[in-house]
């Protein structure tokens, strides 16, 4: 079985914030790392890329008097380096929508589904001052549903409803602020109606799809699917390949969804194995996992399946669409203009990346909106990482070195309490695997912490530091069992904190790059030589929260110097 892991493509107009990161790329990376351990790295492909077309970039370029590509070239490379080199995201392919492979794939795909595409004439907003049609975000106005006065022509940022420019109250051109007039223009539409029942059947029969995704998809289907505009009147995008569509481009959401396929193709082309890309898209032979924010559910649970079905190429529909709710920052929405939140180029200057990876997974909004607070972040790092995991590892490695010459002791006559913890190791590996494959990364990580606490309690109960003086056999059994437990704990945490887990493996005298998930069910071999103990984690200082404003001000000044033009 092949495993495709896909993260929503970040839009390059701004640096992603922590909420963006946990909703897509970080979550996808945790799952991809798990999947490689479970199924073998040769059976897993993890793809994403920079979404760089569309109206926001074009508006920005017009305002700055430069070409859109000059802006996105810089922004794409900045984000790519952050993901790969700073956040340790293990992409097999992180590409971009300006990739030639992507552009040609999109054109070929859309021509292949032309029987579901039709031309219609419609009236759209037109700015007489700027002399151009105003698609999507080129129009701003008041949301008809919630009254938000700065809603965009494609979606309201406050209530999340999808919109069209014609629905906005008091619409204005996003470039110059002039109220638009309506003019007739032709557009190409993708007809979703033939796929209503196949999508309903697919979503209702799925045993793996999260309930929030099922609910949204069925709501769309029950309301009645309609043809959706496939083309736009803006110039920054993939030229529409249809006869008579000169001057039109493909709507970014249609082409970005096809990026999951083109990125897989591009990856195997780069390896000289072009035809192998189909192995990761063939129905019945692949499980595919998509990590997105909840506002993107309709595109992934309705439009993407419809396009895959329209192709008639037996492409696999998504197995799991893991859609997070929203992450708030100290009770408020992230806002760049109001400096509310932390961005991914700021965070690594505040504390270590693995600390961020862990605490974000612990705060992952899987069932409901979650609130990032610094008080909770500090508690997670100091109590869970340092105390529950770090101190456990240090105690065990230290005692194996001190009492057994750095070798895993030989167990004899294991008691029920020893066997129970060994059994819990195997159970936890299976339970975490089950949770991860349902897209429940927070829930899975909580199970690992439970095992760490149980192992700490076991050590405290058995007290091998005392028993070694009077009952060496019992002390041997305790450290044999505890060493095997911390090996499994480190393995299960590797997808979340890869660098720190590797340090734990080094102290165990093991190579994590040669490890497989189910290997950790087997205890360590007696006589195996461990490494020397060293602190894996470090507590955040007591005055950290008190000094936070000063830290953030310093970090933001530093980051502003580094950001490329588009992202300043």
Swiss-Prot record:
GO-annotated cellular components: aminoacyl-tRNA synthetase multienzyme complex; cytosol
Localisation: Cytoplasm
Entry keyword annotation includes Nucleotide-binding: yes
Motif ('KMSKS' region): 333-337
Keyword line: Aminoacyl-tRNA synthetase, ATP-binding, Cytoplasm, Ligase, Metal-binding, Nucleotide-binding, Protein biosynthesis, Zinc
Signal peptide boundaries: none
Positions contributing to Zn(2+) binding: 143, 146, 156, 159
Name of the top EC class for this enzyme: ligase
GO BP: methionyl-tRNA aminoacylation
Cofactor note: Binds 1 zinc ion per subunit.
Cofactor annotation: Zn(2+)
Motif ('HIGH' region): 10-20
Residue positions binding ATP: 336
Catalysis performed (reactions): tRNA(Met) + L-methionine + ATP = L-methionyl-tRNA(Met) + AMP + diphosphate
GO molecular function ontology, one term from the record: ATP binding
Assigned EC number: 6.1.1.10
Function field: Is required not only for elongation of protein synthesis but also for the initiation of all mRNA translation through initiator tRNA(fMet) aminoacylation.
Family: Belongs to the class-I aminoacyl-tRNA synthetase family. MetG type 1 subfamily.
Protein name: Methionine--tRNA ligase
């Amino acid at each position: 079985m092949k495993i495709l892991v896909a993260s929503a493509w970040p839009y390059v107009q701004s640096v992603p914030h922590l909420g963006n990161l946990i909703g897509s790329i970080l979550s996808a990376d945790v799952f991809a790392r798990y999947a490689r351990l479970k199924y073998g790295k040769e059976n897993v492909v993890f793809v994403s890329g920079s979404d760089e077309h569309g109206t926001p970039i074009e508006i920005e370029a017009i305002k700055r008097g430069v070409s859109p590509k000059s802006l996105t070239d810089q922004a794409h490379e900045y984000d790519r380096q952050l993901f790969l080199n700073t956040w340790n995201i293990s992409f097999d392919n992180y590409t971009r929508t300006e990739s030639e492979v992507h552009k040609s794939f999109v054109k070929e795909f859309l021509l292949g589904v032309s029987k579901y595409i039709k031309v219609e004439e419609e009236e759209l907003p037109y700015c007489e001052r700027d002399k151009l049609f105003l698609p999507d975000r080129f129009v701003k106005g008041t949301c008809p549903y919630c009254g938000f006065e700065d809603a965009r022509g494609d979606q309201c940022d406050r209530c999340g409803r999808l919109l069209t420019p014609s629905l906005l109250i008091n619409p204005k051109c996003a470039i110059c602020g002039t109220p638009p007039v309506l003019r007739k223009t032709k557009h190409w539409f993708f007809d979703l109606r033939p796929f209503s029942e196949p999508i309903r059947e697919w979503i209702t029969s799925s045993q793996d799809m999260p309930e929030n995704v099922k609910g949204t998809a069925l709501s769309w289907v029950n309301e009645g699917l309609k043809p959706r505009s496939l083309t736009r009147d803006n110039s920054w995008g993939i030229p529409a390949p249809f006869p008579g569509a000169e001057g039109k481009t493909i709507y970014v959401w249609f082409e970005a969804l096809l990026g999951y396929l083109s990125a897989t193709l591009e990856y195997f082309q780069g390896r000289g194995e072009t035809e192998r890309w189909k192995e990761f898209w063939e129905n019945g032979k692949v499980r595919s996992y998509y990590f997105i924010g909840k506002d993107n559910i309709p595109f992934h649970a309705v439009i993407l399946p419809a396009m895959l079905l329209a192709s008639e190429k037996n492409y696999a529909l998504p197995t799991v669409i893991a859609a997070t709710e929203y992450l708030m920052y100290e009770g408020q929405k992230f806002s760049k203009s109001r400096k509310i939140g932390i961005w991914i180029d700021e965070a690594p200057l505040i504390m270590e990346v693995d600390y961020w990876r862990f605490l974000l997974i612990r705060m992952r909004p899987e069932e409901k909106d979650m609130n990032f607070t610094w008080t909770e972040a500090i508690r997670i790092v100091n109590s869970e990482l340092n105390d529950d995991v770090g101190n456990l590892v240090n105690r065990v490695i230290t005692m194996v070195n001190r009492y057994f010459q750095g070798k895993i002791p030989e167990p004899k006559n294991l008691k029920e309490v020893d066997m129970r913890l060994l059994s819990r190791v195997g159970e936890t590996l299976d339970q975490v695997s089950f949770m991860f494959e349902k897209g429940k990364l927070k829930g899975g990580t909580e199970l690992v912490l439970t095992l760490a606490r149980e192992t700490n309690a076991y050590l405290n109960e058995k007290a091998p530091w005392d028993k070694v003086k009077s009952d060496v056999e019992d002390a041997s059994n305790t450290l044999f069992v505890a060493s095997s437990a911390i090996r499994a704990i480190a393995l299960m945490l590797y997808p979340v904190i890869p660098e720190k887990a590797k340090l734990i493996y080094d102290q165990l005298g093991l190579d994590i790059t040669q490890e497989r998930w189910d290997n950790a069910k087997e205890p360590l071999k007696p006589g195996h030589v461990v490494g020397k103990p060293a602190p894996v984690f470090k507590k955040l200082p007591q005055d950290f929260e008190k000094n936070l404003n000063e830290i953030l001000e310093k970090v933001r000044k530093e980051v502003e110097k580094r950001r490329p033009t588009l992202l300043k």
